[in-house]
UniProtKB/Swiss-Prot annotation:
Stated regulation of activity: The ferroxidase activity is inhibited by zinc.
Description of how the protein assembles with itself and partners: 180 monomers assemble into 12 pentamers and 20 hexamers which further assemble into an icosahedral particle about 36.6 nm in diameter. The N-terminal domain (residues 1-99) crystallizes as 3 decamers.
Binding locations of Fe cation 1: E31, E61, H64
GO cellular component, one term: encapsulin nanocompartment
Protein name, per record: Ferritin-like-encapsulin shell fusion protein
Origin species: Pyrococcus furiosus (strain ATCC 43587 / DSM 3638 / JCM 8422 / Vc1)
InterPro entries: ENCAP, Encapsulin_nc, Ferritin-like_SF, Rr_diiron-bd_dom
Record's function text: Fusion of the shell and cargo protein of a type 1 encapsulin nanocompartment. The nanocompartment is probably involved in iron storage. Expression in E.coli generates spherical particles (PfSPs) about 30 nm in diameter. The purified N-terminus has ferroxidase activity.
Length: 345
């Protein structure tokens, strides 16, 4: 750098207006250099957390450029005039338009993140089946304690264990050009939310099925309502030995369709009869195998979903011709009384 930094000059008086403008120009240069440095380091970082922080700091530096530029334009009217002149030259040569006070464009740049975030959460909320019915506990930290509860000579905790909260992630990409001109399609964020929910529900079901101590019983074909009712009542009886309920069941749509038959003894469809029995909810999800049905006591004393981080959207920055976004959540399931869970298979 060839210019003299006015802060290095020995002095006994305040800066002049010209020196303040010099300081601001130097500050802008320093911030631009810092932006390049952080983005270059992020580009070659394989650690997602390091990359995330570097890009976040780079965005903060870009805000600092705007702050220093605003002060400089206030002090130096000539700079404003020359900037506008430069914008006009670019427009004549390339057709690209730029404006110092283009409020509409500024609002567009600010709004795209919120529009994508709103579409993402819409996909999550509409796609969820399990979390709409299961007890949810929000905690701080990256792990949770599971207290295994038994009902022998009084209610007591017989075992404690600690588990990490799994972090679920999905990335999606939006074209830089589309973000700039506002032609991007928010449905890509909605789809990312739906895929996150698929991972979320698969994790919950996988954890339930693999938990030590749950009961297992034979699942028949359910070709007639009597078979289905018999299976479910036997499983309910087994689960009720360990909990007073209310009881719910988790079932695949194809298996659920077999409940949409008239149960002759009641004159109603079997599913309507079961809704009166399973007041903890009949949860239909594609994320459980057709040949498995889970009957469980739907109460926090038996199980709850642990949320360490709600669904979050982060802008990671440019990757080629796209801008990358990361969707994440930290979620797990805590099973405290496995004896109140029965799997038909």
């Amino acid at each position: 750098m060839l210019s003299i930094n006015p802060t290095l000059i020995n002095r006994d008086k305040p800066y002049t207006k010209e020196e303040l403008m010099e300081i601001l120009r130097l500050a802008i240069i320093a911030e631009l250099d810092a932006i390049n440095l952080y983005e270059q380091m992020a580009r070659y970082s394989e650690d997602e957390n390091v990359r995330k922080i570097l890009l976040d700091v780079a965005r903060e530096e870009k805000a600092h450029v705007g702050e220093f530029m605003a002060l400089l334009l206030n002090l130096d009217p000539e700079q404003v005039t020359e900037l506008k002149g430069g914008f006009e030259e670019v427009k004549e040569l390339t057709g690209i338009e730029a404006h110092i006070n283009d409020n509409k464009k500024e609002e567009s740049n600010v709004e795209y993140f919120e529009k994508l975030r709103s579409a993402l959460l819409d996909g999550v909320n509409k796609g969820r089946s399990l979390l709409k019915h299961l007890p949810v506990t929000r905690i701080e930290g990256q792990s949770f304690r599971v207290d295994i509860i038994k009902f022998e000579d009084g209610v007591r905790v017989v075992k404690q264990e600690y588990k990490p909260i799994p972090l679920l992630k999905k990335k999606f990409y939006v074209g830089i050009r589309e973000l700039n001109d506002g032609t991007y399609d928010v449905s890509i964020a909605t789809k990312a939310g739906e895929l996150l929910v698929k991972d979320e529900e698969s994790l919950v079901i996988r954890e339930i099925l693999s938990t030590e101590g749950i009961k297992k019983m034979k699942l028949s074909s359910w070709d007639n309502p009597e078979e289905a009712l018999n299976d479910l009542m036997n499983a309910l009886q087994e689960a009720s030995n360990a909990s007073a309920g209310p009881f719910g069941l988790i079932i695949n749509p194809k298996r659920y369709a077999k409940l949409l038959k008239i149960y002759e003894k009641s004159g109603k469809m079997l599913v309507e009869v079961l809704k009166e029995i399973f007041r903890g909810g009949i949860i239909v999800t594609l994320n459980i195998d057709e040949n498995k049905v889970i009957i469980f006591a739907n109460t926090p004393a038996v199980l709850d979903v642990v949320v360490g981080q709600d669904v979050t959207l982060q802008e990671l920055g440019p990757e080629g011709d796209d801008v990358a976004f990361l969707v994440s959540e930290a979620i797990g399931i805590r099973i405290k009384n496995p004896e109140a869970i029965v799997v038909l298979e």
